[in-house]
Amino acid sequence: MQWRALVLGLVLLRLGLHAVLWLVFGLGPSMGFYQRFPLSFGFQRLRDPDGSGPVGPPGGPAWLHRPRRGTEGRLETPPEPGPTPGPGVCGPAHWGYALGGGGCGPDEYERRYSGAFPPQLRAQMRDLARGMFVFGYDNYMAHAFPQDELNPIYCRGRGPDRGDPSNLNINDVLGNYSLTLVDALDTLAIMGNSSEFQKAVKLVINTVSFDKDSTVQVFEATIRVLGSLLSAHRIITDSKQPFGDMTIEDYDNELLYMAHDLAVRLLPAFENTKTGIPYPRVNLKTGVPPDSNNETCTAGAGSLLVEFGILSRLLGDSTFEWVARRAVKALWNLRSNDTGLLGNVVNIQTGHWVGKQSGLGAGLDSFYEYLLKSYILFGEKEDLEMFNAAYQSIQSYLRRGREACNEGEGDPPLYVNVNMFSGQLMNTWIDSLQAFFPGLQVLIGDVEDAICLHAFYYAIWKRYGALPERYNWQLQAPDVLFYPLRPELVESTYLLYQATKNPFYLHVGMDILQSLEKYTKVKCGYATLHHVIDKSKEDRMESFFLSETCKYLYLLFDEENPVHKSGTRYMFTTEGHIISVDKRLRELPWKEFFSEDGERDQEEKFVHRPKSQELRVINSSSNCNRVPDERRYSLPLKSIYMRQIDQMVGLI
């Protein structure tokens, strides 16, 4: 009997020890047994057993390897398996709970990002964004106007580089037409500063002329100047005046006539090209320069339709929309028959692709953006059809990583640069302009995928306090180190917040605001970062800092802004200029239109007339309701995947 009692005692002791171990290591919403318990536990081991680096296939992330594609253009099976959530009491990973050990309850990501964002803090950040704009704008007016840009370090103005016509970085943008003032007009209105808006409009009318011996890039003049003039004109003539009284006494459509004058001076770019694709540059007085380059980028030639289309429909003159639409169709018809992709540089005379790289960044970005936004504004069915086909090709050939953003194994989704004909990887870098793409995905309702790509760019921002112009994801280091105050990450942050109302994006915006204040503010404004690591600066403040970066930051924190509350649907151009989406822009004021070959088509054959409810825009509640309610109160991306992304950019 004694040996039986001894055996029973040992069994009970063993069961008791198991119970204690289970209570210590197994309970809690974020804990679970891992295969190598008790040395490692948690949902996922994101590093090699020796802790030396992220788990992944030899030679780098699975992004290097082309995935198999399913029928919908997504991954049919994931790439090389990454770390897997461990078994245990919690099952799959949940939003915002501990990763890799460290106790029960919310983890570091949950604590930092998912707490309430108090109204007082929101108001403080809104005022900081407004103060940032005012500081830059006031210093431009005091030290630089009527020149194009402000040099914020030495407090002086900058115009075209007359001594070096080959300095395209400056001369493509600066046309000696008070660029920063023109570009900032609608930001003044959105911030409710009616007196300064009215003063600025009168200054533009009375002092700005396009009769200048300036050779400018057609794309830059269109999005920065033409787009701003049209936006400000629409604000002035809006009968509802949602931003306050922005009317101008005795206003006689002067901004619209100025926009027409500029567009007429840009039209020679579309002449004498065998493809209909425009020359990249024109002289505002003399037309296309005799030594003009026959090569242009896809975005530069194919991102004119929004501004040119608005102008045509306001004037009742089809010329501008026709030339812009012809250029889009010409580029579209040159896409690869095998992949459906476009390259980034084309010869306008031969239609030969000089640059065969296909990606989402420089050279292609706004081409895709304007296919969708042209449909939203004008309702032309062919624009939506082109966009849907392009998006399908992007998903099929550019997207790498696991199929779902918030589920499964493998690397996080990323869009890479490939050869337009083969779909094969061309390099291992991405550029900062690509950070616009999550915002575009929000517009089409692909919010889940947008969340992951945005998180990747935000992780890069966290590492450097800015976005390097080009980042090598294989080397985990910048290839091009400067940051010219670009708005793309801020834009996507704002649009994702509008879609999800998740406070995470307010925290992201606060991080960006504080980084800009800390690293870029100088004596007379905000300066380009020459080097994102050592934070050395260049003496330049580009106009898009006031027209986009400050605007999106302000709107992110201004919940009561008329943009969000007036009941009017708005869309932003690629330069951040606000345009109301209304019936007038979806109706052609002319009875005939031109087909691609220059012959006239009857309107009924050319134009699709969607009903208003067919057009989906960002402040449509039906789009925002696609996001699960859980996402409004928890992290938009599970902590396990946030940590994975942070590790993959070398942040941890």
From Swiss-Prot:
The chain crosses the membrane at residues 5-25. Its main location: endoplasmic reticulum. GO terms for cellular component: aggresome; endoplasmic reticulum; endoplasmic reticulum membrane; endoplasmic reticulum quality control compartment. Glycans are attached at N176, N193, N294, N337. It is found in: Endoplasmic reticulum membrane. SUPFAM superfamilies: Seven-hairpin glycosidases. Residues 26-652 are lumenal. It comes from Mus musculus. The gene is Edem1. Belongs to the glycosyl hydrolase 47 family. Residues 50-86 are annotated as: Disordered. Extracts misfolded glycoproteins, but not glycoproteins undergoing productive folding, from the calnexin cycle. It is directly involved in endoplasmic reticulum-associated degradation (ERAD) and targets misfolded glycoproteins for degradation in an N-glycan-independent manner, probably by forming a complex with SEL1L. It has low mannosidase activity, catalyzing mannose trimming from Man8GlcNAc2 to Man7GlcNAc2. The lineage of its organism: Eukaryota, Metazoa, Chordata, Craniata, Vertebrata. Interacts with DERL2 and DERL3. Binds to SEL1L. Interacts with DNAJC10. InterPro entries: 6hp_glycosidase-like_sf, EDEM1/2/3, Glyco_hydro_47, Seven-hairpin_glycosidases. Keywords: Endoplasmic reticulum, Glycoprotein, Membrane, Signal-anchor, Transmembrane, Transmembrane helix, Unfolded protein response. It comes from the Eukaryota. Residues 1-4 are cytoplasmic. It is a single-pass type II membrane protein. This is ER degradation-enhancing alpha-mannosidase-like protein 1. GO terms for molecular function: calcium ion binding; mannosyl-oligosaccharide 1,2-alpha-mannosidase activity; misfolded protein binding. One of its GO terms (biological process) is positive regulation of retrograde protein transport, ER to cytosol.
